[in-house]
Amino acid sequence: NAAIVRAMTLGESRGLDEETRSRFELSGAYHVLVVSGMHVGLLAALAIGLIRALGLPMGLAWSTGAAVAFGYALLLDSQLPVSRAAWMLAAYLTASAVYRRRQALNVICGVALAFLCWEPAWIADAGFQLSFLAVAAIAGIGAPLAERVTRPRRQVLRDIWNADRDMRLPVEVVVRRVALRDWLEPLSRIVGLRKRWVELALVGPARIGWAAVSVLIVSAAITLVLAAPLAYHFQRLALAAPFANLAVAPLLIVIAPAGFAALLTGALPLFQLATAAAGLLSTCVSWVSQWDGLQYQTPPPGAWSIAAALASCVLLARAIDKGRWQAWMAAAAAAACWVVIALHPFAPDLKKGRLELTAIDVGQGEALLVGLADGEAGLVDAGGFPNFGSDEPSAFDIGERIVAPYLGRRGIKRLAFLAITHADADHMAGAEAVLRRFAPRELWLPRILLSAEFRPLLEAARESGTRIRFLASGDSFAAGAVDVTAIVCELCTGRNDRSLVLVFDYGEHRFLLTGDIEHEGEQYLIAHLNNPHIAVLKTPHHGSRNSTSDVLLKLTHPTVAIVSAGFENLYGHPHAEVIQRLARRHVSVLRTDLDGAATVSSDGRRLEWKAQRHVQEDSR
């Protein structure tokens, strides 16, 4: 709880554990852990309110509020959201001081333009986009819509016994206030309570309810406007955010002021109040984060989808005050764009009629995307960091942070299969994240005595509804128009040599994926490889010295070899001798450590391969 208070007051999030971060991310409430305009505005409002309470001039109050905002920004090293809020507040207060009409959207656009003049590259920065679009959503859609929906109801409920207020209200509001008083007054006599107590008991909850509706409307507006940039940058939609903000909004009003005051005064009771409220916030966020179906992940939208979504939000902002049917039409258009972004009803970035193999750049690990000829996709291994000599898994989830985003950018929503060649962490650590997000129809594993490392993977597969297929040496089956053959040396002594080897046949070309086999495994492969001519070889064991022997290369005659290895890794992969062997046989080499993601594809007759540095074609 203390770490949450530090994050919410000073932007210091290093004390937060990974579980807490994950809960706030899943609930859509992570923004409260990053000091933003909400915190700056609250702090400035407290300063202005304090000056006014002392009876000092309004000009001094405004100047103090702006000074507090800029001082807070300097304290936090002028982080973008804080600086944005400080300058927006200064512009807004300046307009008030010179008696100019204050337009929040004008202030937002003016400050954004000034920031871009200072640093044009910020236009592509996710933080810049989310920061300004969020406040634009509040000012342009959320606040006006909440005002239009809830203001008449709040006018009815506010100070219900004060008949003098009726003179300044619309007729329809007055009629409802009179009817409510006519109902409450006899009720107070029946129950024997004063009218104010009856109002507090019956009208008070209604006021709270309409305040909650306002928070929901504003949160929904932010969710709507941020859908496109969130899906594009993070491939995630925070559907739970409007509900999480019901707890965030009131608790932030307690935590931030109490935390600031505790920092300034050192008062222990204030710090205890802030940590108690932070504990309640953490409980609420944890509960919301467990709601099934509200943590939605989607491939990034295309340029036209983003443009249409943002344009529909602009139309909605303009239509709110135009009339009911215009507002409904604009809202329907914005909702339709949101649904398109969420469902992403587009084919993945895979060419039908081609077999593709892409080595994803996962550092010193391996994750291979296999694009099948029918337009579906599979994955062989899921990356991870080597953990040799350690029982502790890496805190950085390669599957969640690298593999899944790459597959998402390719427009893939579900995998036909996930194959794990063996249980080393650099091949399977990311598999659980891939299973959770892409729910493969099948999980392929070598039919050998399973090690304990496979058990969490099997449990995750069962939870995802994934069929588990154990493959033995010689198993052959079709994956659409592609034939798949498995080779496994079940009697080999080395752990790596028992890797699942897969051969994908399409037309005239064969792709050989060798896992981490070394000398013993290669000998078994050479003895059991029917039709040994190979077009594409995924070099065994990241190109280690004891792999990719001259015998294997002489037998297979590959055209292209892909090496999956980390840049300047500790193991010296790929070994210089392996690169020399490949060069002597005129094999084109693609390396993830130098070229990034490397792709080879075939239409059954012609090979194409590409990486960051070059694109080649071969008809052999």
Question: What role is predicted for each listed range?
Answer:
Residues N1-A86, L93, L200-V203, T358, ...:
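Aromatic-rich juxtamembrane segments at the membrane interface
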Residues A73-S83, A97-R102, W118-F128, A228-L239:
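Membrane-interface helix caps and helix-loop-helix hairpins in membrane proteins
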Residues L42, L60-A67, V82, A86, ...:
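Hydrophobic alpha-helical transmembrane segments
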